[in-house]
């Protein structure tokens, strides 16, 4: 796997993360846009559809060779101004949705529809889809004049499956440079209201949406997902700012970004196989988000990178315990979450029961500051590689890395510091499962070359079998192994 050079921030830091979080929130709208497609240094074009599953995590083809995820090209045709079709950019004007839809209908592939600065009132839904204000078309871009200058204000308010913008089976589309919000005036996180989804991208008759770029959007006052990408591939979400969910209860409420496969489908040959999506350089105010970034169902070989999350009510980056596999989670900053910064496996679910995430996910080079756990792996999630993360515990932190029933997990080269009494840099414990699923003990765990400095406590092994604890540096802390547990190598 490709190596990573960490920055030089090392040593005790027990209180500065609060100030950093405030800075992040104040500067969130200045996130630098990605210069282009993101991949590994040496890239090849995606391999044609073949047979067999992937074996290597991240942005690779079936053979394991790095790929560059294709992105839609720039506008090559006309620019259509929605005000020429009757849209009024003044706030509290008439319904502007028909004019926007008319401009999209008039556009041809290669054209773009532009929303000049102003506020556009969306009071009606598409005649062919009563769930959506606006329906995207393949090859036609939709662009505002800036996240703070162009606003789409929807009147959708709690209707089932309601979406401000929907794209089903679309390709080669850019959606950029505006804010989506709603007229919801109630409390945040405690009620329901606004649209279910800000942006919804999905398949159409089994054909995935692909080559879609969603960038520099502000999305707030939604109920379920700010951006939802379902059964699609080659979708890039970059430079967006997401906050203020109106509900954060169970059943899928209050997710910032959700990348989903199809429930009960694990078929890499399917035309709607979920893979090769990028979630990069987005910012989340997690005070009213259940999860900031969520991967769900058998979605694989996605990249979640360089995102900043300040606070979240549950696990900030969550692989949701429904077979998500071979995803790469790197270079993210997660600050002050009430639960784990990054979690693999989930005990929830009503319609779809959650337990283990899939095999071979790669969690590396993240900065995890002041969360309850830095990384949590549970409920039978197998073969996770956790390496080169920088974890700084806060007063309420319980563990830097916590591993329960997670066979084959490797912890390598992580740097862990901070914490108060009761905090352990690395902790292995029995998994009691969820409704009888996922019970077990840690097994086949490798804890190697980690650095634990000025932490309240070092490594604690309460349960498990077949461990290797090798060449770790524990500064002023300790290694505690419960009676009756054998560790094959300790040095």
Predicted regions and their residues:
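Bacterial signal peptide processing site
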Residues: 30-33
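Extracellular beta-strand-rich solenoid/capping regions of secreted or surface-exposed proteins
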Residues: 100-109, 121-143, 151-176, 181-210, ...
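Short glycine/acidic-rich loop motifs that flank beta-strands on beta-rich extracellular proteins
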Residues: 111, 124-125, 147, 153-163, ...
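Acidic, glycine- and Ser/Thr-rich low-complexity intrinsically disordered tracts
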Residues: 47-65, 69, 75, 82, ...
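Extracellular beta-strand solenoid repeats
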Residues: 114, 121, 135, 141-143, ...
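C-terminal motif of bacterial Sec signal peptides marking the signal peptidase cleavage site
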Residues: 26-28
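Acidic Gly/Asp/Thr-rich repetitive segments characteristic of extracellular carbohydrate-active
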Residues: 82-116
């Amino acid at each position: 796997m490709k190596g990573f050079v960490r920055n030089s921030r090392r040593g005790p830091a027990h209180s500065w993360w609060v100030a950093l979080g405030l800075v992040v929130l104040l500067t969130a709208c200045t996130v630098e846009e990605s210069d282009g497609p993101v991949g590994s240094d040496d890239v090849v074009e995606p391999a044609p559809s073949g047979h067999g599953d992937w074996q290597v995590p991240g942005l690779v083809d079936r053979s394991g060779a790095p790929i560059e995820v294709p992105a839609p090209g720039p506008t090559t045709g006309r620019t259509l101004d929605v005000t020429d079709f009757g849209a009024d950019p003044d706030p509290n004007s008439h319904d502007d949705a028909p004019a926007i839809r008319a401009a999209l209908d008039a556009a041809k592939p290669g054209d773009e529809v532009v929303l000049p600065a102003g506020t556009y009132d969306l009071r009606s839904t598409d005649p062919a889809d009563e769930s959506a204000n606006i329906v995207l078309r393949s090859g036609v871009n939709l662009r505002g004049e800036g996240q703070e200058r162009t606003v789409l204000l929807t009147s959708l308010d709690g209707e089932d499956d309601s979406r401000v913008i929907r794209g089903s089976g679309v390709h080669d589309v850019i959606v950029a440079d505006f804010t989506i919000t709603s007229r919801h005036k109630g409390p945040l996180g405690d009620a329901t209201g606004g649209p279910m989804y800000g942006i919804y991208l999905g398949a159409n008759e089994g054909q995935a949406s692909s080559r879609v770029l969603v960038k520099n959007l502000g999305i707030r006052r939604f109920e379920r997902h700010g951006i939802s990408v379902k059964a699609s591939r080659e979708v890039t979400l970059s430079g967006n700012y997401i906050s203020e969910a109106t509900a954060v209860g169970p059943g899928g409420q209050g997710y910032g970004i959700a990348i989903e496969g199809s429930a009960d489908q694990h078929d890499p040959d399917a035309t709607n196989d979920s893979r090769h999506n990028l979630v990069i350089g987005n910012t989340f105010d997690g005070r009213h988000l259940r999860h900031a970034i969520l991967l769900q169902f058998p979605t694989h070989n996605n990249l979640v990178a360089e995102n900043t999350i300040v606070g979240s009510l549950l696990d900030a980056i969550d692989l949701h315990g429904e077979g998500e596999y071979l995803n790469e989670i790197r270079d993210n900053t997660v600050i002050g979450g009430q639960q784990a910064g990054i979690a693999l496996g989930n005990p929830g679910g009503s319609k779809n029961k959650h337990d283990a995430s899939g095999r071979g996910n790669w969690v590396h080079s993240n900065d995890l500051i002041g969360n309850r756990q830095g990384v949590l792996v549970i409920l039978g999630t197998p073969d996770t590689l956790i390496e080169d993360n920088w974890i700084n515990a806060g007063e309420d932190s319980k563990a830097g890395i916590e591993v329960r029933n997670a066979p084959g997990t490797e912890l390598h080269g992580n740097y862990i510091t901070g914490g108060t009494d009761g905090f352990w840099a690395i902790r292995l414990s029995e998994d009691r499962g969820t409704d009888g699923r996922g019970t077990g003990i840690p097994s086949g765990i490798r804890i190697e070359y980690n650095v634990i400095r000025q932490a309240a406590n070092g490594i604690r092994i309460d349960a498990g079998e077949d461990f290797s604890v090798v060449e770790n540096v524990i500064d002023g802390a300790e290694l505690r192994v419960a009676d009756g547990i054998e560790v094959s190598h300790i040095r």
